[in-house]
Every structure is written in structure tokens, then in C-alpha cells.
């Protein structure tokens, strides 16, 4: 089975073709980073318009790279939510139109399920069950995964997501958009333990997380300290240490609670080098294993949508003709794939 995946939930237009026998056949991606840089963040209306401009050329590119035409496809998957409604509707409209025009089955995919399953695109894939840490600009959650569609949200951020905290703290430090990766680059030059930032909610039972207070603590520290480059690097390092430690503590607690031996890290923040190293060391000490996608599949992409959609289409799940976008869509409400 060969499926075209369409991702347009935020500021990346991602298109891919996935074959259940041969694997990923093509992958095309356009990022809107330069478009939004002057505004310091994503402008929804601009994002939607840019998706409109880029989506059809990228579909043509992905099909050409796979040496295929639309007639060769067995199905179409598009991101249905969560995300920016205007951006979602661009992908949903194009996906539904292609499916209707060429009489192909179509499925709307949950964006975070795509991230959760992104490690399945690699050669070394996790076996069910496992614990998933999903960390991005819009979400931070711990999910118990018994199978595709069999998800239990064990804990999540009660305010800012980890990626959002990275971006907002970077902005406070005067770093250009996108701030998260730039903050991490600055943090690599910092001296560890120069500052002690709090580890929010780690002193309380449960698996929920909070990062807004950490952002406020960073803002106060930035305002009170000198503005030289080394001090800024030390503050960035302390902030990153606090986020990584907090996520690690929550993961360890969740693993103990569930008894799972494997951990999946996915979402944009999963590309963070310090987070990967810390959780890999933790899992080695626990006798388990950690899985994460390659860098290009940590951020939003069409490949993860094609893969997730293929699993559901193979199970006979198909969307009706209505064009739907769901800006909010709880992960644990998805239908299981038997």
C-alpha cells in the first residue's frame, strides 16, 4: 500500500510518499521560518497563505521523487489536527480534493500521533508497549502506548509546553526566531551549574508538568544579571538543564508507574542534544532503551503523517467527504487500530 502524507498543521508544509513494503519513497519539506522571523513567531494568516502557495508544487515534487503519479497511490493522509485551523484546512482541502478526484480513500491524522509514531520510520523500531514523551512547541505530554490508537495520557503540561518555554525564554534573551534551537546553541557555551533554576512540579506527586514559572524565573534572572555573552550562555545553560531534568524526572516516575522498559521521545524538542543524552543515560541505567526519530523527522513532516495514515487506512478506517480540521483533539480519544 502506498500513501501520500500531507502535513500543514503550523508553519511547515510537508509532503511524503510511504510504501508499507519499501518504506519511505520520498519526502519534501518547506519551512516558513524566514517568513515569520520578522514577527518573532508564527502568524497564522501568513502561514495559511504560504501553505496554499507551496502545497501543490511540493506534492508534484514528492510524487516525482517517488517516480509515481497520483493514480499509483492507494490512499491519502492529511493532518486533521491539532494545529492552526487555517493551516489545517489547507491540507485537508487539498487531501480531500485529491481523494475525491481520483477515487482514493483518505484519512485525517492526529498530528501528535504522527510524532509518536515517527520512530517507526527508522530501522530500529520500538515494540509495544512503551512510554512516549511528546515534546514540541504546542504540547508536552507523557503517553502510555499499548498499540496504535491505544493511548493513555499519563501527564501533560498544565500551562506552557516545553518548546514554547524554550522559544519565549530565547525571545527574552534577544535571540532570533526560531528561538529554541538558538537558545540550545548558546547553552552549549555555558558553564553548568552557574545558576540553579527550579524543577517545576517535581516535588509533587503525579506526572503533570509546568514550564510557565520556569520562564518567569528565567526572565527575572536575565533582568538582574549582566548582559555579557558568557553570563547569557550560563543562564541559557541553566534553563536548559532545568527543562531536561524536569522531563527526565517525570519520565523516570512514569516508567516506574507503568513498568514499561522502552521510552520514545518525539516532537520538535526531541532534537535537543542535551535531552537525548540525558534520557539515553537514564534509560541505560534503568536497563531499558530509548528511541527517537532522526533530526529531520523530529520537526513537523509529511513522512510521519503518511506512516500513521497508512496504518489506519490498512485497518479500514476512512474519512467521509467532509473537510474537517480540529484545532483541539485529545490524543486519547483516537480509535484503536486492531
From Swiss-Prot:
Fe cation binds at residues 111, 115, 300. Gene3D superfamilies: 3.30.420.40. One of its GO terms (cellular component) is cytoplasm. Binds 1 Fe(2+) ion per subunit. InterPro entries: ATPase_NBD, Gcp-like_dom, KAE1/TsaD, Peptidase_M22_CS, TsaD. GO terms for biological process: tRNA threonylcarbamoyladenosine modification. Its EC number is 2.3.1.234. Keywords: Acyltransferase, Cytoplasm, Iron, Metal-binding, Transferase, tRNA processing. CDD domains: ASKHA_NBD_TsaD_bac. GO terms for molecular function: iron ion binding; N(6)-L-threonylcarbamoyladenine synthase activity. It catalyses: L-threonylcarbamoyladenylate + adenosine(37) in tRNA = N(6)-L-threonylcarbamoyladenosine(37) in tRNA + AMP + H(+). Its cofactor is Fe(2+). Pfam families: TsaD (PF00814). It is found in: Cytoplasm. Its main location: cytoplasm. Substrate binds at residues 134-138, 167, 180, 272. Required for the formation of a threonylcarbamoyl group on adenosine at position 37 (t(6)A37) in tRNAs that read codons beginning with adenine. Is involved in the transfer of the threonylcarbamoyl moiety of threonylcarbamoyl-AMP (TC-AMP) to the N6 group of A37, together with TsaE and TsaB. TsaD likely plays a direct catalytic role in this reaction. Belongs to the KAE1 / TsaD family. This is tRNA N6-adenosine threonylcarbamoyltransferase. It comes from Shewanella halifaxensis (strain HAW-EB4). The gene is tsaD.
Amino acid at each position: 500500500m502506498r500513501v501520500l502524507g500531507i502535513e500543514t498543521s503550523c508553519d511547515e508544509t510537508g509532503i511524503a510518499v510511504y510504501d508499507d513494503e519499501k518504506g519511505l519513497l520520498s519526502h519534501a519539506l518547506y519551512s516558513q521560518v524566514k517568513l515569520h522571523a520578522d514577527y518573532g513567531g508564527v502568524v497564522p494568516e501568513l502561514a495559511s497563505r504560504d501553505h496554499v502557495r507551496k502545497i501543490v508544487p511540493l506534492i508534484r515534487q514528492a510524487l516525482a521523487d517517488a517516480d509515481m503519479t497520483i493514480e499509483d497511490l492507494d490512499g491519502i493522509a492529511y493532518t486533521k489536527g491539532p494545529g492552526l485551523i487555517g493551516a489545517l484546512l489547507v491540507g485537508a482541502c487539498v487531501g480531500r480534493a485529491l481523494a475525491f478526484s481520483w477515487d482514493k480513500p483518505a484519512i485525517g491524522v492526529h498530528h501528535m500521533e504522527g510524532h509518536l509514531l515517527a520512530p517507526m520510520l527508522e530501522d530500529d523500531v520500538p515494540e509495544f508497549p512503551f512510554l512516549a514523551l511528546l515534546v514540541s512547541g504546542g504540547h508536552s505530554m507523557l503517553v502510555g502506548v499499548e498499540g496504535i490508537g491505544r493511548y493513555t495520557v499519563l501527564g501533560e503540561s498544565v500551562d506552557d509546553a516545553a518548546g514554547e518555554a524554550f522559544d519565549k525564554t530565547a525571545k527574552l534573551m534577544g535571540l532570533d526566531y526560531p528561538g529554541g534551537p538558538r537558545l540550545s546553541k548558546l547553552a552549549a557555551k555555558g558553564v553548568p551549574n552557574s545558576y540553579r533554576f527550579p524543577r517545576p512540579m517535581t516535588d509533587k506527586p503525579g506526572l503533570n508538568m509546568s514550564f510557565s514559572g520556569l520562564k518567569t524565573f528565567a526572565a527575572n534572572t536575565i533582568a538582574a544579571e549582566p548582559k555579557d555573552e558568557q553570563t547569557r550562555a550560563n543562564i541559557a545553560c541553566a534553563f536548559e538543564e532545568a527543562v531536561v531534568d524536569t522531563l527526565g524526572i517525570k519520565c523516570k516516575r512514569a516508567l516506574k508507574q507503568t513498568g514499561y522498559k522502552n521510552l520514545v521521545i518525539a516532537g520538535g524538542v526531541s532534537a535537543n542534544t542535551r535531552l537525548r543524552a540525558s534520557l539515553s543515560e537514564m534509560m541505560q541505567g534503568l536497563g531499558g532503551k530509548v528511541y527517537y526519530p532522526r533530526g529531520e523527522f523530529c520537526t513537523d513532516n509529511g513522512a510521519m503523517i503518511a506512516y500513521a495514515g497508512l496504518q489506519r487506512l490498512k485497518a479500514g478506517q476512512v474519512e467521509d467527504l467532509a473537510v474537517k480540521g480540529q484545532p483541539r483533539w485529545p490524543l486519547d480519544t483516537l480509535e484503536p487500530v486492531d
